[in-house]
Design a protein with these regions (language model features):
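N-terminal small-residue-enriched
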Residues: 2-532
Length: 532
């Protein structure tokens, strides 16, 4: 049997999934980015179709990429050596094979279904703070070395030897390490979507439109680098996003609810599917009774779980080390100094088992860990990738992340949250004479340098005389992240991690994240009018 080319492999692999599913196939797209080079080609590949077709090594290696594509340790070491051949002080290979299938259901029928296969490698070479990067969608040894030569062009100061051997790490699994979605019958995936769609449509006579988006991924990555590290893991992911539109007296409202997890079909119990539909309907109908509060500066109480988006966006990005290394973040000169009250502790963790933002290893091969950013009100750490950790003389925190093999890693959040505090939720609300209780947020903007933010509260409630009263919607809240952090007056003990479909964008890259919060009182935020 002759080796299959990459294009042939993609067509056969995707057809195998979609043929069973009766779904159209979308192959992996080519997406070049400014400042990045693509090496190799799409048409020529020599990846063996099975391990049996490859010449067996003296000591048989195991692992996904050696068994399926013939990329053994020797190939990885030669690629790393090529990356170091012009004077770089670090080289890294990132391999990825991801199959993702999606279904879009609208008004009682599937309107779109697809399978996408991404397969490729990125090679990065560092020289101090400088980065050379190239990617290829061809996994032959020749194409990998060509990508390494392209990435190595940034350096020309001699040759550093590649490691004599790579030591395979086996990270403690935080999510299942076997294929979860490829074996699932198409009818089972369709039934998940059908159930939510039916429940949405039947949720209330006012519902006029029901939409469901479903996605399931089986993703495998491998990282090998010039420090001798070799690590490989599976990263399952799924989400279901339900949108409801209702109409009353000629007025329409739309809202949504979603759940996501690093898991398989067992995640979608009947109870969860029914809850997703019911919540989307409930949140939509609530908007018919919502009004706009009076504008002005007032206390804002952030509800548990979903309000963590404000922490993530308005404050979390300011803790990412690249922004601090470059002097962009307002926190760049505040390490070790108080930034909040003593009952405020903020954490970013990759260890939240099965959570959307969990990572047993980051995209540089650093093991996942729990990083305390603000401890008892004092800033104690940034979020580091390898480059920023070098700059600050600290260990990487496991936050080097990338969208896929086409991109170099950056410091990114994983699951970011505030720990529980000493107050009772009822006590927090009772302390407010007149203010806003913010529940769900929609789109917003953040200026990383100054930390200024503007967000829309999709749903919330007025606080009047220490009680929650009338619902409000689409209210603009405007503030400054560091200022709001310093104005946190109370933190309750009712901490929740949110299980929604959160995706964070930075420098053109999107990655899945998680967030959470207990009930939190900020003494003053500027509240604007209803968005038109």
């Amino acid at each position: 049997m002759k080796p299959m080319g990459r294009r042939e492999f993609l067509e056969l692999a995707a057809a195998g999934v979609a043929g069973a599913a009766g779904l159209p196939v979308l192959g992996g797209c080519r997406k070049s980015r400014p400042g990045m080079a693509e090496a190799g080609g799409l048409d020529v590949a020599a990846a063996p179709s099975s391990v049996a077709d490859a010449a067996p090594p003296a000591a048989r290696e195991t692992g996904y990429f050696v068994e399926n594509f013939g990329i053994d340790e020797a190939t990885l070491r030669r690629t790393i050596a090529e990356g170091l051949s012009r004077g770089g002080d670090y080289a890294e290979v990132f391999l990825q094979h991801k199959t993702a299938d999606g279904i879009v259901f609208e008004d009682g029928q599937v309107i779109d279904a697809s399978v996408r296969v991404d397969l490729g490698a990125g090679v990065r070479v560092l020289l101090g703070d400088q980065t050379g990067y190239a990617f290829t969608e061809d996994l032959t040894p020749e194409a990998l070395r060509a990508a390494a030569r392209t990435a190595a062009a940034i350096a020309a100061a001699g040759v550093r030897a590649a490691p004599e051997r790579l030591v395979r790490r086996r990270p403690e699994p935080l999510y299942p390490q076997q294929p979860l979605w490829l074996p699932v019958a198409p009818a089972e995936k369709r039934s998940i979507v059908d159930r939510v769609g039916r429940k949405l449509a039947a949720g209330d006579p006012a519902v006029i439109k029901a939409s469901v988006r479903f996605r399931a991924e089986d993703d495998v990555v491998l990282i090998a680098n010039s420090d001798g590290v070799l690590v490989e893991e599976r990263r399952p992911m799924t989400f279901l996003y339900a949108t409801c539109t209702a109409e009353r007296n000629g007025r329409r409202e739309t809202n949504w609810f979603s759940r996501s997890r690093r898991g398989g079909p067992e995640f979608y119990t009947d109870d969860l599917l029914d809850r997703i539909a019911a919540e989307a309907v409930r949140r939509t109908l609530l908007l018919f009774d919502a009004t706009a509060p009076e504008p002005g500066e007032m206390p804002v109480v952030l509800a548990p779980a979903t309000s963590g988006i404000l922490l993530h966006e308005a404050m979390g990005h300011g803790f990412e080390a690249d922004f601090n290394r470059k002097g962009i973040s307002i926190f760049a000169s505040r390490m070790g100094r108080p930034v909040a009250r003593e009952f405020v502790t903020i954490v970013d963790s990759g260890l939240e088992r099965d959570h959307r933002g969990a990572l047993a290893i980051d995209d540089e091969g650093t093991p996942g860990r729990r990083t305390v950013l603000v401890e008892k009100g004092r800033l104690v750490s940034y979020l580091h990738d390898r480059i920023s950790a070098r700059h600050y003389g600290v260990e990487p925190t496991g936050n080097g992340r990338r969208e896929d093999f086409r991109f170099p890693p950056l410091p990114r959040m994983r699951v970011t949250f505030m720990e529980p505090g000493p107050h009772a939720p009822e006590e927090v609300i009772a302390s407010v004479k007149k203010g806003l209780y913010a529940v769900d947020f929609s789109n917003g903007e953040v200026t990383i340098g100054a930390g200024d933010y503007s967000f829309y509260v999709k749903t919330g409630f007025r606080i009047e005389d220490g009680r929650l009263t009338a619902p409000v919607k689409d209210v603009n809240v405007i503030g400054n992240g560091p200022d709001s952090l310093s104005k946190i007056e109370m933190v309750a003990g009712d901490f929740e991690l949110d299980g929604g479909t959160w995706t964070c964008g930075k420098n053109g890259q999107s990655v899945p994240v998680g967030l959470g919060l207990p009930t939190v009182k900020v003494s003053a935020i500027n509240v604007g009018g209803v968005r038109r």
